[in-house]
């Protein structure tokens, strides 16, 4: 038995690796834009939970004896939910909006084992630094934030521009270890059952 990560996110994989788990990676093929459109008007937490669930549900049938984890993160700032910026221009625009401000990173988790499905979200408050225009442009030029929810990373270059967080750091990076641990316990497992040691 193993943990299957229904994601191609290097950050989610690194979180599990640093916690002693070498997950099997099976990226989910989900039309996120269509799902987001169908969830229009839903609460932000529900949106990220449903995105995570869709990813896990696509992958789970291929791994009936394994624990499948789907995840999705988005940044809630000024009552607007933001995903990945994808472009340099969008990254710069977002950073000019979020610098010096506070926002909430919401991460949805879906953990499936057999017929059991656990869906939960975690929220962490982010206090963004007053980053200079030059630093914002250079950060965007690095390419690092283009495929990250909220256009930032906590664990790499983006860490320069985060003054503080309130909540779970692993959730900000993309997968809350406390949420996953609680889910494993509910499924009758120990976290250490999945350590590759």
Curated annotation (Swiss-Prot):
Gene Ontology MF terms: nucleoside triphosphate diphosphatase activity
Active site: 72 (proton acceptor)
Keyword vocabulary terms for this entry: Cytoplasm, Hydrolase, Nucleotide metabolism
Record's subcellular location: Cytoplasm
InterPro entries from the UniProt entry: ITPase-like_fam, Maf-like
Top enzyme class: hydrolase
Gene Ontology cellular-component terms listed: cytoplasm
Cofactor names: a divalent metal cation
Reaction catalyzed: a ribonucleoside 5'-triphosphate + H2O = a ribonucleoside 5'-phosphate + diphosphate + H(+); a 2'-deoxyribonucleoside 5'-triphosphate + H2O = a 2'-deoxyribonucleoside 5'-phosphate + diphosphate + H(+)
EC nos: 3.6.1.9
BP GO annotations: nucleotide metabolic process
Similarity comment text for this entry: Belongs to the Maf family.
Biological function: Nucleoside triphosphate pyrophosphatase. May have a dual role in cell division arrest and in preventing the incorporation of modified nucleotides into cellular nucleic acids.
NCBIfam families found in the cross-reference section: maf (TIGR00172)
UniProt name for this protein: Nucleoside triphosphate pyrophosphatase
Species of provenance: Corynebacterium glutamicum (strain R)
